[in-house]
Structures are given as structure tokens and as C-alpha cells.
Design a protein with these regions (language model features):
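P-loop/Walker-type NTP enzyme "switch/lid" segment
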Residues: 39-108
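Glycine-rich phosphate-binding loop used to anchor ATP phosphates in small-molecule kinases
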Residues: 107-124
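Walker A/P-loop NTP-binding active-site region of P-loop NTPases
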Residues: 4-67
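Alpha-helical segments flanking ligand/cofactor-binding loops in enzyme cores
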Residues: 25, 104, 126-127
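Inter-motif core of Ras-like GTPase G domains
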Residues: 122-134
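N-terminal regions of ATP-driven nucleic-acid and macromolecular assemblies
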Residues: 1-4, 129
Length: 134
């Protein structure tokens, strides 16, 4: 079972995504199999930060809406490090259970899952926090 970490902040622009990507990369370099989830719809930029934006074909929203197989949304960034990109918009009908189910699917496939949440304290944070342990 993967350890699940939420990286969150009440304010944007404070380096949350930088910290999330650093923790994920360092953990992967130490031999842990790591999944980094960009949970910042509309403003997510981990794909750009990690230099894989040209390879984004699907997002975690495509998994929720059954538009792709779960593995088809993952992007291998480096050895032991995969990214699950964020959708460009956050649909209002997504629930904490929907997001938690996506994370749960990958639970036994990774050692660590880092969730980069959107800025602010709102419904989106509640949804993503429900899938994390720390």
C-alpha cells in the first residue's frame, strides 16, 4: 500500500508544486516507486514543470468519467516516477469518492503517492484531502 501525501496551501504562488515535484523526484531517486498527482484543475502545471506537457493525452478526470483506462493517463517522467496530470477545468459534479477511487486504484502499484492540491481552502481541497493520509 502506498503512503499518500497531500501538499496543500491556503494561498497560491508559494511553491507548493515545486515542493511536490521535489519530494516526488527525491523519493523516486531513492528507489521508491512514486506517483505524482496534479490535483489543481485549470491551473495545474506539473506537466510543464516536469517537461512532459507534449505527452499529456489524458488526465485523472478521464479516469473518473471512464474516458480512458487508468494506466493510459499516466506519464512516465523518470525511472520510478509517474505523473497523473490535471484536467483543464474542475467539473462541479466530481466528488471526494470519485477522486479517492482514482487514488485507490493506484494504491498497490506505487510506494508513495504525492497529491499536489489546488491553492485555497475550498471544496477542491476537501475532495483531494479525502484521498491522502498525510
Amino acid at each position: 500500500m502506498a503512503e499518500k501525501f497531500l501538499i496543500a496551501s491556503g494561498k497560491g504562488g508559494v511553491g507548493k508544486s515545486t515542493i511536490a515535484s521535489f519530494l516526488a523526484r527525491e523519493s523516486a531517486q531513492k528507489g521508491h516507486k512514486v506517483l505524482l498527482i496534479d490535483a489543481d484543475p485549470g491551473l495545474g502545471a506539473l506537466d510543464i514543470m516536469l517537461g512532459v506537457q507534449e505527452r499529456v493525452m489524458n488526465t485523472w478526470l478521464d479516469i473518473v468519467t471512464d474516458n480512458c483506462e487508468s494506466e493510459n493517463a499516466l506519464i512516465e517522467v523518470a525511472e520510478n516516477l509517474s505523473l497523473l496530470p490535471s484536467p483543464s477545468v474542475y467539473p462541479e459534479d466530481i466528488t471526494a469518492e470519485d477522486f479517492s477511487n482514482v487514488v485507490a486504484y493506484f494504491d498497490d502499484k506505487f510506494d508513495m503517492i504525492f497529491i499536489d492540491a489546488s491553492a485555497g481552502i475550498d471544496k477542491n481541497l476537501e475532495i483531494t484531502a479525502s484521498a491522502a493520509e498525510r
